[in-house]
């Protein structure tokens, strides 16, 4: 029996536009951005940033170094935000309804530029019992340690938990730990939850 639901953020709650982000970074002179960026798990210094091993200032300095141009922190942050579109209102409404019956968690590979803005813009703390963020716990999906951290901290059982993510590798790890899973498709509504639950 499902008692808990764990949502990924990017690609599940928030629609993504990686190509807009890539284009914006290239416009700043960061030509090889595609070596670092992915819809699921970043690479290199961007991975360090999502693991909380690099400050916002260090992230911006690294982008400046790789771009070879004098660009402001704001220009860099604006380019980085091109990755995120919005959270459809119907998804938040569904989560709010689900919270009446289930414990609701967010497990996300994210960073200290994106998450605080999304938290404030959408009042996410009204919809989730707790957030598990890669930049806070210093692990990124699909590393099993981020899942184990959540299990231990929340006091939940994997077999009683539905994990929803758009990353196949993340789903594979969750399944190996005993979670029930759903691989989300791009721009999928959450109506499937009515059938699963």
Language-model regions: role of each:
Residues 100-101, 177:
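Conserved dinucleotide-binding and phosphotransfer motif residues
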Residues 8-11, 52, 98, 106, ...:
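Generic structural signal for small/hydrophobic residues in well-ordered secondary structure
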Residues 103-105, 180:
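Proline-centered loop/turn at the N-terminus of a beta-strand
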Residues 92-96, 171:
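Short amphipathic alpha-helical segments and helix-helix/interface helices
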Residues 2-89, 93, 111-114, 197:
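N-terminal helical cap/lid subdomain that shapes the substrate entry/recognition surface
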Residues 1-3, 111-112, 116-197:
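Asp-based, Mg2+/Mn2+-dependent phosphohydrolase catalytic module
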């Amino acid at each position: 029996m499902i008692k808990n639901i764990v949502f990924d953020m990017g690609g599940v709650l928030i629609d993504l536009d990686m190509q807009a982000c890539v284009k914006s970074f290239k416009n700043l002179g960061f030509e090889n951005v595609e070596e670092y960026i992915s819809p699921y798990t970043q690479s290199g210094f961007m991975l360090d940033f999502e693991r909380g091993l690099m400050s916002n200032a260090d992230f911006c300095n690294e982008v400046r170094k790789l771009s070879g141009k004098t660009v402001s922190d704001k220009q860099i942050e604006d380019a980085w935000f091109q990755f995120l579109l919005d959270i459809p209102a119907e998804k938040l409404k569904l989560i709010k309804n689900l919270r009446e019956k289930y414990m609701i968690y967010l497990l996300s590979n994210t960073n200290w530029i994106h998450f605080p803005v999304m938290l404030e813009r959408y009042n996410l703390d009204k919809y989730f019992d707790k957030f598990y963020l890669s930049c806070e716990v210093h692990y990124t999906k699909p590393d099993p340690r981020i899942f184990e951290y959540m299990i231990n901290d929340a006091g939940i059982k994997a077999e009683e938990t539905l994990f929803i993510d758009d990353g196949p590798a993340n789903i594979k790890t969750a399944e190996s730990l005993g979670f029930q899973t759903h691989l989300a498709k791009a721009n999928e509504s959450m109506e499937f939850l009515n059938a699963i639950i």
